[in-house]
Amino acid sequence: RRQRQMCIRDSCGGTCEKRPRTNEYNGAKSCAVASSLYVGETGCAFGCLGFGDCVAVCAFDAIHINPETGLPEVDADKCTACGACVKACPKMIIELRKKWPKNRAVYVSCVSKDKGAVVMKACKAGCIGCGKCVKVCAFDAITVENNLAYIDPQKCKLCRKCVNECPT
């Protein structure tokens, strides 16, 4: 079964309390439609819109929008890693990745390529591209490209020093 080797990750950590609303959208409650019309109700143009296109396409009832965070959550026991939710997300924040050892993982919960000051204003959880994680990683597993940190799962040893050093 594919599920044993793959998992779904939501690469947006901008929960409702971390991303203040800057405007209101009254159009169709569809991520695909909304993303073609505007950037979202928060200051982050890269974050989850929260309308649940990913939920609608899941044939296994494995993904839902958490009403408290406004973000998609995946039930790993139901998910078959078919990738339907990945294709449905116009913001490309849902990724299909190889499972890490013991289902542990360290990853960046942000896809914003904006500069640090813009990210900090839009979302308290966003990667500001400061590079502190790169400096503390003894395994050269982290790089910063386009103002965003990337963690190489082949090099990462799950020591979590980068997590402790991250200011966001």
Regions found by a protein language model. Name each.
Residues 29-33, 74-76, 102-108, 144-146, ...:
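Short cysteine/histidine-rich metal-coordination sites, predominantly Zn2+-binding motifs
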Residues 9-18:
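Small-residue-enriched alpha-helical segments and adjacent helix-cap loops
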Residues 48, 126-128, 156:
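Short Cys/His-rich zinc-binding micro-motifs
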Residues 20-59, 63:
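Glycine-rich active-site/cofactor-binding loop and its immediate structural neighborhood
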Residues 3-8:
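Short, small-residue-biased leader/transition segments that mark boundaries at the very start
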